[in-house]
Amino acid sequence: MTRYVLLPSPLVGAATWRPVAEVLRAGGASVAVASTDGCTTPEQVQAAYVAAVPPGDGAMVLVPHSNAGYLAANVAAAVGSAGVVYVDAALPASTGPTTLAPSELLDFLAGLADEDGVLPPWTQWWDDSDGLFPDDATRAEVEADQSRLPLAYFRSAVRPPTGWTARPSGYLAFGDTYAEELERAISLGWPTRVLEGGHLHQLHDPAAVAAGITELSSRIA
């Protein structure tokens, strides 16, 4: 039995993965969803991801979404994960350190931080984020689970383990939000799949996203 550990972005929290977790469990998989509540540094977030991995036998697959993709290779090395399925996620550099936000995003975030250097909740970064959610109730659930991270989090850098791109990996993209990362995954020879949708498509169609994760997991086994 495959064991999935779903890694949410520290910006939006575990609520973004709960519908997919329910679908995967209904299909007979073992599923854990990491919580990054209270985490404000990359080290704390990585530790929370590692702590979410339950003991047990069987193939284990990490499933990072969005910003969690930067840390997934380090988590996989720490827990001995069998593979990683990146879901509309950022990817670190193949070698050397990677800042936890691209330079153009850092410039944008610098203008959002308050006098203490703390950013507003993620859904307040944008003029209109309503299209990201299927309904008001789902939006409220996600907003209740959001954390406010310091700007310093995104100015930090992570250094993935040497040779991390050789670990069995797949990439599930939602539309073209992470088009460059998708192209990179293809160039690395990873199996890929694209579902048309926004960045939180797992909230709109958890069954399709769960099916995509399951398919890619079987292709990297």
PLM-predicted stretches and their roles:
Residues 2-57:
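Active-site catalytic motif of lipid deacylating hydrolases and related acyltransferases
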Residues 147-207, 211, 220:
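Conserved serine/cysteine hydrolase catalytic core
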Residues 77-120, 153-159, 182, 186:
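Flexible "cap/lid" loop of the alpha/beta hydrolase fold
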Residues 118-163:
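Conserved alpha/beta-hydrolase catalytic His-Asp/Glu region
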Residues 19, 74-78:
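Active-site signature of alpha/beta-hydrolase-fold catalytic machinery across serine-
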Residues 7-11, 65-66, 89, 174:
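Glycine-rich His-Gly loop
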Residues 63-72:
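Gly/Ala-rich beta-loop-alpha elbow adjacent to hydrolase catalytic centers
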